[in-house]
Amino acid sequence: MDQLTRKNRLEFNKLQKRLRRHVGRAIADYNMIEEGDRVMVCLSGGKDSYGMLDILLSLQRTAPVKFELVAVNLDQKQPGFPEHVLPAYLDTLDIEYHIVERDTYSIVKSVVPEGKTTCGLCSRLRRGTLYGFAEKIGATKIALGHHRDDIVETLFLNLFYAGRLKAMPPKLRSDDKRNIIIRPLAYCPEEDLEAFAQARAFPIIPCNLCGSQENLQRQVIKEMLRGWDKQFPGRVETIFAALQRVSPSQLADNALFNFTDLTLDRSAPAAIEDDAPLSWSDLATTEDTTDAVNIINAVNIG
């Protein structure tokens, strides 16, 4: 092994450990996988789902709980879809797998006008089929390959185009309460998954076989976030962290916080008494409005 190959191997090992750590932490933080779970891993043939399956198989060997993995691909009968690729790859792994055949492509083409993006309807049909199949095979969890950048992009898509503060949760119960969806890659940056897929030489299947243009709005958001992260490294990571530290009382949604019934309560002592000694650190660190008012009253400016 020459020096370059040795260096590449070291870099790959660091990347793999980082992704394993991200996935393991996400699973632990949201209790994604429990003892005896049968996890249906949705495999599209893209870099993210390949990476998710690879990492979950690796973690399965040393996990503190016993669980099963079942790989499932939905063949939507898109023209030119290479049907042999996924079975050939999965045959090399020690894993149960299923190829589900549903001609959702014809349905989408018959409903969506020519030139319009088919991604939305295609996604809904795919989701419905996978939910039903999960029940059929007794899966207790459905693992999807959305990563950290997908989650942040969805936040801004909803913010800019739908006027909603909404993203993708790492763990979700379906509306009919019959399925639990998990996103083990929730903490993983897309660039790490791209590098991992390249290093592992996964047989990637392109997502444009249907001829649909990539969702333009999502692409705009993706480019915006890439620009931000290039100019201000860590910006996307910080935005994701904000999704984990929400303060409902500092927003404006009456469904999350009862603004209507707010009342005064002066029974408790004030945070800062008028005659209490003050320091510059009091002025620098005070965030509560009540404290600020007391400080203004207490400090003799003139």
Swiss-Prot record:
The keyword Iron-sulfur applies. Gene3D superfamilies: HUPs. It is found in: Cytoplasm. Binds 1 [4Fe-4S] cluster per subunit. The cluster is chelated by three Cys residues, the fourth Fe has a free coordination site that may bind a sulfur atom transferred from the persulfide of IscS. Its cofactor is Mg(2+); [4Fe-4S] cluster. Keywords: 4Fe-4S, ATP-binding, Cytoplasm, Iron, Iron-sulfur, Magnesium, Metal-binding, Nucleotide-binding, RNA-binding, Transferase, tRNA processing, tRNA-binding. Signal peptide: none annotated. It is an enzyme of class 2 (transferase). InterPro entries: Rossmann-like_a/b/a_fold, TilS/TtcA_N, tRNA_Cyd_32_2_STrfase, tRNA_thiolation_TtcA_Ctu1. It catalyses: cytidine(32) in tRNA + S-sulfanyl-L-cysteinyl-[cysteine desulfurase] + AH2 + ATP = 2-thiocytidine(32) in tRNA + L-cysteinyl-[cysteine desulfurase] + A + AMP + diphosphate + H(+). Pfam families: ATP_bind_3. Pathway: tRNA modification. Its EC number is 2.8.1.-. It comes from the Bacteria. One of its GO terms (molecular function) is 4 iron, 4 sulfur cluster binding. Homodimer. Catalyzes the ATP-dependent 2-thiolation of cytidine in position 32 of tRNA, to form 2-thiocytidine (s(2)C32). The sulfur atoms are provided by the cysteine/cysteine desulfurase (IscS) system. PANTHER family: AMINOTRAN_5 DOMAIN-CONTAINING PROTEIN, SULFURTRANSFERASE-RELATED. This is tRNA-cytidine(32) 2-sulfurtransferase. It comes from Teredinibacter turnerae (strain ATCC 39867 / T7901).
